[in-house]
Every structure is written in C-alpha cells, then in structure tokens.
C-alpha cells in the first residue's frame, strides 16, 4: 500500500471532540457544567483576576514597597581629582600603574576616572577609563591630553 496525501488519516482517539457545556443532562456536562453547586467559581463572569484572594488583602499589597534596589551592572571607578596630579613632573604619561608607583593611589581595584576638582599647573598625558567634562577641560587648557582606554 502506498501512502498518498489524500489517504492520510489521524490515529483513532487522537482527536477528541470539544465538550459542549450546558446543553442538557444527557450531554454529560449539563446543568452545572462541571462547576459544582454554588460559589464564586460556579457563577458567570468567572474566573477572578490574577492575585485575587477572595477579599483578603492580597500579597502584593501586604508586602512593603521596597526602595533603593542595587544598580545592575554598575560601573565602579577608582576616582582621582585633577589637583592630585600636580605632584607629577611635567610631560609625564599618567596611568594607573604610574599613580600606584608614585604613591598617589594605593590598591586600586577598579579602572581610573579623573574628576575636575582643583587646579592643574602641570602639562600631562593622562590615560584613564573616564574623564569628567571639567577634568578634560582643565587638562587640555594646560596643554596636556586625555586618552581613553577600556
């Protein structure tokens, strides 16, 4: 026997007819339609909304509204003000390793970010992960340059 598209049939018992509720006792789901005798779940307009607990104060309203959740994937920096860079010699290339070697920073765990507090009198080439706008302006006013690295 060859299989043809027009001769295909589904297996016996694999497709069940939809149960028609409320169409007489002989239909199997007449009268109360399988919802029981009385109560909220047997009435029309059911079901109740998600989270409804029968009039009891629901869980989502009992639990306090918490604030100050931690920032996900927060970037942390080792910060340094421009005024601290005056301790270095003119024309120095400044990076995280040099700052540790000179004793300006101790045990840095995060990338370097330069902040713009204070004044700068020394011309430097600063390599950092981030600069504030005021820090970048102060470094470039003196004749230095800012280099970003990731």
UniProtKB/Swiss-Prot annotation:
Keyword Aminoacyl-tRNA synthetase appears in the UniProt entry? no
Q: Which InterPro entries match?
A: Ribosomal_uL15, Ribosomal_uL15/eL18, Ribosomal_uL15/eL18_sf, Ribosomal_uL15_bac-type, Ribosomal_uL15_CS
Keyword terms? Ribonucleoprotein, Ribosomal protein, RNA-binding, rRNA-binding
Has UniProt tagged this entry with the keyword Nucleus?
A: no
> Quick one: where's region Disordered?
1-57
Q: What is an annotated GO biological process for this record, any one? A: translation
Give the superkingdom in one word: Bacteria
Sequence ranges of Gly residues compositional bias: 25-37
A GO molecular function assigned to this protein is:
rRNA binding
* Pfam families from the UniProt entry: Ribosomal_L27A
Biased region (Basic residues) positions are: 13-23
Family annotation (SUPFAM superfamilies): Ribosomal proteins L15p and L18e
Q: Which GO terms describe its cellular component?
A: cytosolic large ribosomal subunit
What family is this protein classified in? Belongs to the universal ribosomal protein uL15 family.
Q: Which NCBIfam families match?
A: rplO_bact
Subunit structure and binding partners: Part of the 50S ribosomal subunit.
Q: What function does the entry list?
A: Binds to the 23S rRNA.
Protein's UniProt name: Large ribosomal subunit protein uL15
Specify the species.
Prochlorococcus marinus (strain NATL1A)
Write the lineage as a comma-separated list.
Answer: Bacteria, Bacillati, Cyanobacteriota, Cyanophyceae, Synechococcales
């Amino acid at each position: 026997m060859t299989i043809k598209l027009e001769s295909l049939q589904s297996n016996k018992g694999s497709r069940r007819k939809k149960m028609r509720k409320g169409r007489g006792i002989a239909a199997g789901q007449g009268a109360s339609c399988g919802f029981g005798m009385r109560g909220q779940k047997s009435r029309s307009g059911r079901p109740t909304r998600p989270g409804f607990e029968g009039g009891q104060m629901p869980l989502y309203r009992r639990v306090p509204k918490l604030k100050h959740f931690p920032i996900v994937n927060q970037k942390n920096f080792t910060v340094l003000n421009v005024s601290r860079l005056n301790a270095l010699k003119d024309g120095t290339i400044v990076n995280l390793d040099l700052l540790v070697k000179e004793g300006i920073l101790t045990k840095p765990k995060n990338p370097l970010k330069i902040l713009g507090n204070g004044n700068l009198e020394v011309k430097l080439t600063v390599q950092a992960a981030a600069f504030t706008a005021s820090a970048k302006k102060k470094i470039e006013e003196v004749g230095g340059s800012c280099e970003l690295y990731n």
